[in-house]
A protein has these predicted regions:
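Divalent metal-coordination and catalytic microenvironments
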Residues: 37, 58, 111, 142, ...
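General structural feature for long, well-ordered alpha-helical segments within catalytic domains
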Residues: 26-33, 46, 50-57, 107, ...
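Non-cysteine beta-strand/loop elements that form the S-adenosyl-L-methionine
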Residues: 110-112, 121, 227-229, 385-391
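Acidic/His- and Gly-rich active-site-bordering loop/insert found
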Residues: 3-138, 143, 147, 151-167
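A structural signal for isolated positions on well-ordered beta-strands in alpha/beta enzyme cores
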Residues: 66, 170-172, 329
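Metal-dependent amide/peptide-bond hydrolase catalytic core
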Residues: 2-7, 252-426
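Histidine/acidic-residue-rich, glycine-tolerant segments that coordinate divalent metal ions
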Residues: 83, 117-137, 143-144, 159-289, ...
Length: 426
């Protein structure tokens, strides 16, 4: 791939060389690559086809990608001499053990993408690139994230060959973001942050128009944990609930009363929210069941509340279950802390987007209650995540994340590549 074409002019912005419009041949290739991923979604830690496709394309560009020891996911360096990270310094993080990071502001710039799909059916009935895998879909935009980082890698590899890459860059294609506590731990244990000084990522946002990004300094996502509860009782006849444990009522009370109790035991400004995704019990209308199961998520806005949440939530569940004479077994699964965008890296992304598309292409965004394991990287090095607009301009209908009809305006791929390329060059 060459960037030398009528459509690849260069601009000088703040002394940095920035490639202009991506060559049409590369834009078309990236769209085709994304559509291929979209048609073949793979769940967390099962992304073997996706991993092979990423590795093959990077090798074809003359790079030396390596697959994570877990078997899926890829790490690939550009401009790192002899494979030795530069600017290595001590790691001071508090998340999963990572190995070594660089001192802030030095070392490698890492670009991270997640590569896994979701266990939901693709509901786009007349889409030529809809999922070909039953009950599997790329409904969170990870196919786009992957393509953006891949495309950026191809551009930066060419610029490196031309002597125009001012700093080393690492591409991180991470598996299993959708699986708590996230596949970031595998990437970190495989040295994803060795020598890294800063890290950036994007996440598709169907509420932001394609051609724009959303940015926010400080927390941009929330902490997210998983909650699994089993309730047990002797069961009995629905004619005599007073002689047994009415397990359906007990489960219903857990659903309604636990969030209310928890809401009175933490600061309301913390935004702690419990939302249930599954409640199951019973098989007959006239039989009080002996067993019930509930599962859901616990989300909160700040790190301090996240640290307190397990004890508070578990105590509230026990209280409600005991009140209804139900035995409770609680599995509180730790998930991820909030993604907290560091000021300097947030400004880097802002400057990069403005350099490519003007000040009007950046909008301020609110903190989301969604969880993202990108946060684990930020426990060790400064970084930031931008919301990549994927809504067709003028479109009123929002095809939301984690819904079977989710899709994107594929112009967002070009925008993401331009953003990351400019960030690497500024």
């Amino acid at each position: 791939m060459s960037l030398e074409s009528e459509e690849s002019e260069v601009d000088l912005v703040g002394g940095a060389v920035l490639p202009g419009t991506l060559p049409e041949v590369l834009r078309a290739e990236l769209v085709a690559f994304r559509r291929d991923l979209h048609m073949h979604p793979e769940l967390g830690n099962q992304e073997f086809r996706t991993t092979a496709a990423i590795k093959e394309r990077l090798e074809r560009a003359g790079l030396a990608p390596r697959v994570l020891s877990s078997g899926t996911g890829v790490i690939c360096d550009i401009g790192v001499m002899d494979g030795t990270p530069v600017g290595t310094g001590p790691d001071t993080g508090t998340g999963p053990d990572t190995g070594t990071g660089a001192a802030p502001g030095t070392g490698i710039l890492a670009l991270r993408a997640d590569i896994d799909g979701l266990p939901i059916p693709d509901m786009k009935s007349e889409c030529p690139y809809r999922s070909t895998v039953p009950d599997r879909a790329h409904a969170c935009g990870h196919d786009v994230h992957t393509t953006v980082v891949l495309g950026t890698g191809l551009v930066l590899a060419e610029l490196h060959r031309q002597g125009l890459l001012p700093r080393p860059v690492r591409l991180i294609f991470q598996p299993a973001e959708e699986v708590l506590p996230g596949g970031a731990a595998d990437a970190l244990l495989d040295g994803a942050l060795d020598g890294v000084g800063r890290i950036v990522a994007v996440h598709c946002d169907p509420r932001v128009d394609a051609g724009r990004i959303g940015l926010r300094e400080g927390p941009i996502t929330s902490a997210c944990d998983r909650l699994e509860i089993a309730l047990d009782g002797p069961g009995g006849h629905t004619a005599r609930p007073h002689l047994t444990t009415d397990l359906v009522t007990a489960a219903a009370r857990v659903v309604t009363d636990v969030p209310a109790l928890v809401g009175r035991r933490v600061d309301s400004r913390s935004g702690l929210a419990i939302t249930w995704g599954r409640v199951e019990s019973g098989h007959a209308p006239n039989v009080i069941p002996q067993h019930a199961e509930l599962s859901g998520t616990v989300r909160c806005l700040d790190l301090e509340t996240w640290r307190l949440a397990p004890d508070i939530v578990v105590a509230a569940i026990d209280e409600v279950a005991n009140l209804h004479r139900a035995k409770s077994e609680i599995n509180y699964v730790r998930g991820v802390p909030p993604v907290v965008n560091e000021a300097g890296v947030t400004e880097l992304l802002r400057d990069a987007m403005i350099a490519r598309r003007g000040a009007e292409s950046v909008e301020n965004t609110e903190q989301s209650l969604g969880g993202e394991d990108f946060s684990w990287y930020l426990e060790h090095v400064p970084g930031a995540m931008a919301r990549l607009g994927v809504r067709p301009p003028g479109e009123r209908t929002i095809r939301d994340l984690h819904q079977g009809d989710f899709d994107v305006d594929e112009h967002a791929i070009t925008v993401g590549v331009e953003l990351f390329t400019a960030a690497a060059l500024l």
